[in-house]
Amino acid sequence: LAGVVGFLAALTRVQGMLLIFPAVYYVVAGALQKENRRKIKWTDAAVFLIPMGFAVYLMINYHLHGNAFQFLLYEEGDPWYQTTKWVGTNIAQQYQNAIEFAGLEIIIYWPQMILFFVAAGILLVGIKENIRMEYLLYGAVYLGFTYLSGWMISGGRYMLCCFPLYLILGQISSGKGRWAVLAASGAFFFLYSFLFLAGYA
């Protein structure tokens, strides 16, 4: 079942391909453990359903357009202008755009730039909270891959699918940490509601 879900994720979303990293880690790391070693089973081959999902997507592109990577050409065109750049370059671009584009900085560029560092910090907290390495690996790869986007305008929406962040926040053991998460969530919810009612949507 997990393989089928991974297949569908990779078929419908590029980030779905990233599930291959925690899946392979789970199989390999479990087999290499000295204690509680997990034997590799034939059902573990289901991890290969994940890249097969993306392969089917490429086949659909080829069948419809004669080019397996036609979707990249669509993303590069108007109005998306999507390219791939190094994470550091994109973070710097977010900062520059926040300075140059008045009115958009508070709803697009500052949040996207800050979100990267907040997400990275949450993943580090996950190490302290002993979150399973498969989840941390997926969260890190997902974060890095998402911020390779050379013209990002929906970073917050993309990061909504980074489920390890929610698992980590839900597992914070410190009482003060839990209250801090609750307070921050409430404050941002209030800010979002205010901006929405003010016509920033």
PLM segments and residue spans:
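Hydrophobic/aromatic-rich transmembrane helices and adjacent perimembrane loops
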Residues: L18, I153-S173
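Membrane-interface junctions at the ends of membrane-embedded or membrane-associated helices
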Residues: L1-A2, V27-W42, L169-A184
